[in-house]
Amino acid sequence: MDTSHEIHDKIPDTLREQQQHLRQKESEGCITTLKDLNVPETKKLSSVLHGRKASTYLRIFRDDECLADNNNGVDSNNGGSVTCADKITRSEATPKSVPEGLQVSEKKNNPDTLSSSLSSFILSNHEEPAIKPNKHVAHRNNITETGQGSGEDIAKQQSHQPQVLHHQTSLKPIQNVDEGCISPKSTYQESLHGISEDLTLKPVSSATYYPHKSKADSGYEEKDKMENDIDTIQPATINCASGIATLPSSYNRHTFKVKTYSTLSQSLRQENVNNRSNEKKPQQFVPHSESIKEKPNTFEQDKEGEQADEEEDEGDNEHREYPLAVELKPFTNRVGGHTAIFRFSKRAVCKALVNRENRWYENIELCHKELLQFMPRYIGVLNVRQHFQSKDDFLSDLDQENNGKNDTSNENKDIEVNHNNNDDIALNTEPTGTPLTHIHSFPLEHSSRQVLEKEHPEIESVHPHVKRSLSSSNQPSLLPEVVLNDNRHIIPESLWYKYSDSPNSAPNDSYFSSSSSHNSCSFGERGNTNKLKRRDSGSTMINTELKNLVIREVFAPKCFRRKRNSNTTTMGNHNARLGSSPSFLTQKSRASSHDASNTSMKTLGDSSSQASLQMDDSKVNPNLQDPFLKKSLHEKISNALDGSHSVMDLKQFHKNEQIKHKNSFCNSLSPILTATNSRDDGEFATSPNYISNAQDGVFDMDEDTGNETINMDNHGCHLDSGKNMIIKSLAYNVSNDYSHHDIESITFEETSHTIVSKFILLEDLTRNMNKPCALDLKMGTRQYGVDAKRAKQLSQRAKCLKTTSRRLGVRICGLKVWNKDYYITRDKYFGRRVKVGWQFARVLARFLYDGKTIESLIRQIPRLIKQLDTLYSEIFNLKGYRLYGASLLLMYDGDANKSNSKRKKAANVKVNLIDFARCVTKEDAMECMDKFRIPPKSPNIEDKGFLRGVKSLRFYLLLIWNYLTSDMPLIFDEVEMNDMISEEADSNSFTSATGSKINFNSKWDWLDEFDKEDEEMYNDPNSKLRQKWRKYELIFDAEPRYNDDAQVSD
């Protein structure tokens, strides 16, 4: 150890004074960590040095214990002005890599020992040329990366390793060290050899960079993301002798500052955002599908999570896909009726706008807000598009359906559409019930068929006849779509700026701007213009939050990338099949409306044809049945254009003539046939951007036809979708109300063969229900509107006389009730056969009965009567209003969890006032009374026919209550209701009005066999069934008595 003292004596006095000064400061608690004094940094570092390869702070390692135990001076046995370092590995450097003054003993091949003099020397000479990388250190780093253990895991592992006595020095790196102060080579080597023989240093956890987390450790996701990103920074070279990386040549000791974890992570994220924004990306390797199954690509998953965090934190929308259009899917919870209902979002549904229905909603919002509690929340009016071969083909199909409407076989017959390429496609109308699908309304420069056949050559080998047979299978027909640029009047400004540079500009093609410019007589043209806009704006003024929520939900940006926990393997497989890289789904080029309008391109019809072709060919090749294929095809549409905007000018849909000679596989009829009165000319479709050949007219949509037959599904409901559904609706209205020359709301664009029409967007009343139960009741003694033709008047009057409508003011149009494990359904034709008295009362009771106990009836009846009383008073105050053809929709959840407060509320029956297509407001009657074909006889009074129906419902509900409770008064309070039911349970029974004992917890035999009875026996007074239930027939065979007032059916 004498050699060590000699080395110590050769250190200059100035250096020794500096060391004493440092020891004095450390004893005072000023220095608690190992840091480079050359760096002008005053902040204290954390106790843990973060960063991969220890590169965040000069690659200098320090002891976790902060060297706090040896502050009394330099140990005489150590005798050197050195500090601890770690991970000194076998040197493979050339003699030029290490200065001559330093040669490491061969004893240092132990990775856990180190030379303290060497670290001190490197600190003073860190600007020397880089030393050759150490292969052993790099190999060990790779092993650590594979292990992916956190810094805490490494510390725990090292704590279990054998520990030996560690004589530690308290000296820190000095600020300025002169090379001349270092001892000669031979003397220094001998001292180093002596130290390494006598002392074995313990492992130091902070000398190791923090590697990736292990697969089983999910608590360090943010560190994992940061460490993945460090690879993108230019790495510094690694010192082969000490494992210390030298700094880049651009390093300046006076300006360098240590990056903390947060700042480093933020800078790395920003750098990755900038890297990904570059369009020229290196081609990514897509592994084979089998290899993906065996070993998931965890790196891609980490990068995916990184992208999600960046999009949230940085607000980067460059890789988000803003859909320009959405497809409408059939709504399956519909109860009866001809009107097709489609799902727009999870919260909203839409249907064809008929006559003045939107004006009714907007008028009630302005003038009678107290009635809104009974109405579904109105959102607005949508412009909806559908492609068709031509106007002549559309009317031809309409005539064929109209001529064969009494033939039940024609209702399920597929309608053939002959395309210009002679490829006939039969469209099946079975609803799919699939979730909402986002599409891009971008035209293609090339035929979509050619693109698909190029990607999948095997499709070309399929014979056209096979394609036709495949298309006539269970594939649904092409559905209508809502294009964003057609509906500026309803899009919130916060969303519109994503698509346009001038969101505040007035849209020429919107409902709002065109509604005030129509030429024909409308209800509001005689009044104030501002009032008209308020009453006919096409957008709600009350439910703005719901409107914005629905629009954002539908047109929200979609990121086409693999999810962390789903479809990772599937994504790779389909990318391999399609011959594309994963980056293909995240790149997008948009086109400005100006460029699109000046370019000759295919119209939206090709996009529709492409979707149909993909749908049909998915039967040909099972591998094509995947949503990722559809995404890639849609991505091709958007990638076909260049530009900075995603908004397409509507002019481009007329300017292109290529659709007439390009291959097109599927252009089907729109189920969007909105019927609007002739006074509503041009509200939606009329705009400078449209070339319209529309003819004026009205469709008075009605729920009833003269045909007494209907095709039923398993539950008795027939659900149409697609082309046949809307053709049936049109054929009915054309035959009963209006002729072809009256068609006004359907706008044909001859160049693109697009049908543009109006849909009304409403709240989905079944959204929070698990098993929705509904009873559709047609209210009033008059169902035809003020513009109905003579034939329509006569047919509707005869129908009222034959059913319960004339005597009761209400008739049943549909029933759907959950019975423990299945639905009981009845259609409107069944409702027409229901008689006044016990039959009507039995259907009403069966709707409220849950199939388990009579208690369900007892609880529901008071709630329902209370709502009917409130509704009666509100309708009574609507002087001058007429609710012709309106309905009451009674709804509740048949499978609600009573323990949950929200679900329990859904189990309560709710009265909804719907169907205002033929309703007339007071303003309508005042402004256009002389234009009505059949105006109200007493326009200044309330609708007495509707009020009669409300009173009839209350009459039969009260009749059922009195029988079950022995004429007890109605109980509206929930606490009192619970007390009454508890008292009944204690007495085990309740004596009814007939003297029989009724147990509220028991079933009602009269209702239990409702769905099992034969209707012929049901209507035969001498049948065994009628004799069996004779007592109930006598009890409920009652009818409310009304004066035969002529005003009741005005």
Swiss-Prot record:
The modification Phosphoserine is found at S150, S396, S469, S537, S539, S566, S583, S589, S646, S664, S670. Residues 156-173, 566-624 have a biased composition (Polar residues). Residues 508-522 have a biased composition (Low complexity). SUPFAM superfamilies: SAICAR synthase-like (SSF56104). Residues 87-117, 129-177, 269-319, 396-423, 508-539, 562-625 are annotated as: Disordered. The keyword Cytoplasm applies. One of its GO terms (molecular function) is inositol hexakisphosphate kinase activity. Residues 290-306, 402-417 have a biased composition (Basic and acidic residues). Gene3D superfamilies: Inositol polyphosphate kinase. Substrate binds at P772, C773, A774, L775, D776, L777, K778, M779, G780. It catalyses: 1D-myo-inositol hexakisphosphate + ATP = 5-diphospho-1D-myo-inositol 1,2,3,4,6-pentakisphosphate + ADP; 1-diphospho-1D-myo-inositol 2,3,4,5,6-pentakisphosphate + ATP + H(+) = 1,5-bis(diphospho)-1D-myo-inositol 2,3,4,6-tetrakisphosphate + ADP. Converts inositol hexakisphosphate (InsP6) to diphosphoinositol pentakisphosphate (InsP7/PP-InsP5). Involved in phosphate regulation and polyphosphate accumulation. Required for resistance to salt stress, cell wall integrity, vacuole morphogenesis, and telomere maintenance. This is Inositol hexakisphosphate kinase 1. The lineage of its organism: Eukaryota, Fungi, Dikarya, Ascomycota, Saccharomycotina. The gene is KCS1.
